[in-house]
């Protein structure tokens, strides 16, 4: 698939299997449907791929080496309920600058960001991704949950209970 530049996959697709787009050197853009898993090396060596959005439907995870050596990849947005990011998923994505990782991630494999010297992980405080970034010396930026200004008791609304709670202090 040397000349493949763009792919729009059908909504009926359930999973992206192992090595599906392996080595598609000209692939710049892909729209992922509501798949539940991205297989091992599914996009490995897609050296022209610049951005990827992992849909909310991906629950199980991103398997090992899924985006290995995608050297033009700059930004990854991971949405939803993903549970695991396999080993070496973004290894040698040397231009990767930003990836957001949701709270739902419970496991991140070895060498995921090896040779990604400029990456910043956007993560939630005290999440698995936050601890992973700190432990592995990876730059990170914290994402804060949106709260309404004045919501002292964090129940999602501003009311008299917030005033009562504030008066205690």
Per-region residue spans from a language model:
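Phosphate-coordinating loops and pocket residues in cytosolic domains that bind phosphorylated ligands
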Residues: 54, 135, 168
